[in-house]
Amino acid sequence: MKAKKRIFFTGGGTGGHVFPGIAIISKLRELDTNIEFFWLGQKDSMEDKIIKEHAYIKFIAIPSGKLRRYFSLQNFTDFFKVIFGIIKSFFIIKKYKPQIIYATGGFVSSPPIIAASLLKVKSITHEMDLDPGLATKINSKFANKIHISFKESTKYFKNKNVLYTGSPIRKEFSNPNPNIIKNLTQDTKKPIISILGGSLGAEILNKLTLNIKNKIDAYFIHQCGRNLDATRENNYLRSQFFNAEEMASIIKFSNIIISRAGSGAIKEFANAGACVIFIPFVKGSRGDQIRNAKLLEEQNACFKIDEENLSESKIINIIKEILENKEKSNILRNNIKEFHNQDSSNLIANLLLKEFGKINAG
């Protein structure tokens, strides 16, 4: 009887740090039925909620503090949370003996990567954004390999074992069902404008939607997060969340997407060849979304409006320009596809299987 392969994934805080890991796990399950999957994350967190929807992944809670570049009294207590997270990860790894640990980003991913280094367990960290966050900068000092989602990120990891893999997307996005968006929009013949606030929702996008939805002749799909109730009105559908199949259909078949500029969302839009207006998140952010969107804007792959320049009239004018200029829309759709031009889930899954082979051979 073959010994079970075992892999730990770790990452969280937002869906963008969780869904890529799930995409890799789904592909690994297709390729090899002899693998056990674990996820290390914080209790009652975004990753806890998402992972518990997947019975084949065992979730293990670990403590971890937020890593900050600025002074805060919380830095003192969070430092000890990180230490406790490393200690707990150390003993969890010793107990379950995974052959590989794969980090998908977020502060919670650093303690397991550091513990893996102490125990000489193979580890890989994946930077989803254009430039590395503090967690990835820390992880890169301890991990054996670094995977990146943007080719342009290589310059941030000099003298490191870096591989451009792209960002994995969930399998539901590979073949979206057009009937889903027809049902969501009651088979409207109007242009479809989808405003997506991400896994945490976005207050500024919620306000924007309510202000413009009756000023443009279109059907609006609005993903609002927990701060608003779901509703359906004439030419307007609002939901706190959409499942993966619904989101895949929305992204593929909407005429326009208005969204934040998280790396996971960008890759899903690129895979679909979506026409996107990005409004990057600023408050509480390290500026990664601004740089993500700026890169695409420079390649004529999107429209970008910074929050400080956002106005009702500006967004309405851009929407009208896209709807009235099909050539411009097609240029944006073709150019954004260049940011997701490989099957990243399959690539990474096969790389991990090779790592398992090397470990077992050794």
Swiss-Prot record:
It is a peripheral membrane protein. UDP-N-acetyl-alpha-D-glucosamine binds at T14, G15, G16, R170, S199, Q289. Pathway: Cell wall biogenesis; peptidoglycan biosynthesis. One of its GO terms (molecular function) is UDP-N-acetyl-D-glucosamine:N-acetylmuramoyl-L-alanyl-D-glutamyl-meso-2,6-diaminopimelyl-D-alanyl-D-alanine-diphosphoundecaprenol 4-beta-N-acetylglucosaminlytransferase activity. InterPro entries: GlcNAc_MurG (IPR006009), Glyco_trans_28_C (IPR007235), GlycoTrans_28_N (IPR004276). The keyword Cell cycle applies. GO terms for cellular component: plasma membrane. The keyword Transferase applies. It is found in: Cell inner membrane. It catalyses: di-trans,octa-cis-undecaprenyl diphospho-N-acetyl-alpha-D-muramoyl-L-alanyl-D-glutamyl-meso-2,6-diaminopimeloyl-D-alanyl-D-alanine + UDP-N-acetyl-alpha-D-glucosamine = di-trans,octa-cis-undecaprenyl diphospho-[N-acetyl-alpha-D-glucosaminyl-(1->4)]-N-acetyl-alpha-D-muramoyl-L-alanyl-D-glutamyl-meso-2,6-diaminopimeloyl-D-alanyl-D-alanine + UDP + H(+). Cell wall formation. Catalyzes the transfer of a GlcNAc subunit on undecaprenyl-pyrophosphoryl-MurNAc-pentapeptide (lipid intermediate I) to form undecaprenyl-pyrophosphoryl-MurNAc-(pentapeptide)GlcNAc (lipid intermediate II). Belongs to the glycosyltransferase 28 family. MurG subfamily. This is UDP-N-acetylglucosamine--N-acetylmuramyl-(pentapeptide) pyrophosphoryl-undecaprenol N-acetylglucosamine transferase. It comes from Borrelia turicatae (strain 91E135). The gene is murG.
